[in-house]
Amino acid sequence: MVKYLSQSEAIELDLDLFEMFHVGQLMELAGLSCADAVAECFPAQTHPRVLVVCGPGNNGGDGLVCARHLSLMGYQPTVYYPKPTLMSLYENLTNQCHHMEIPSVKKCPSLSDAEEDYDLILDALFGFGFKPPVREDFVPLVKMMQETKVPIASVDIPSGWDVEKGKQSECDFEPKLLISLTAPKLCAEHFKGEHHYLGGRFVPPALQRKYQLNLPDYGSKLVVRL
């Protein structure tokens, strides 16, 4: 059985990966994996309009990469990136979205706008470094995701969930799709949605042994269903 990681294990594993790979390389593979998982569950023919919600950390970077790949797969992504990270890696990812002519919005969509304008929300707001409560700046966005009927695909962690314990009283939305990256986190044991995929086909054998990950065989795929 695949190992589900604690928050401290996930952080330590990430640090080990950063010693072996450039963070941009890992982000590219993670974001592409997310796009593949979306395509498996929500085809562009039925869910073309995707709101990609990006947070200020690595999870948001994964979202920017995913938006770019979704645009190449026939989707019509729109990026909402309320707190951009002022580092060259993230600025480059943002510029790449601009070059792909991916539109962005400056304000958090209202509940009615989200349900009228989008067929899917990609939640790349908070990652496994998150600790409750949700920052005040992001409360309206999380509230919209809690109340919307638009299906949500969450990247690694449903935003606002405790990384180990799962749903919190102030954030209890259930995504339709959870895309765990590298290895699932403990909160994924509480996931009750329809689709759970694992992406991140880049963990060297030594790290798989060190953390006893027992990862599935990806074969030629970028993601596997759990």
Curated annotation (Swiss-Prot):
NCBIfam families in UniProt: yjeF_nterm (TIGR00197)
Protein's name in the database: NAD(P)H-hydrate epimerase
Positions bound to (6S)-NADPHX: N58, N59, G60, G61, D62, G127, F128, G129, F130, K131, P132, P133, D156
Reaction(s) this enzyme catalyzes, per UniProt: (6R)-NADHX = (6S)-NADHX; (6R)-NADPHX = (6S)-NADPHX
Domain YjeF N-terminal: 10-215
Cofactor note: Binds 1 potassium ion per subunit.
SUPFAM superfamilies found in the cross-reference section: YjeF N-terminal domain-like
UniProt cofactor(s): K(+)
Species annotation: Drosophila persimilis (Fruit fly)
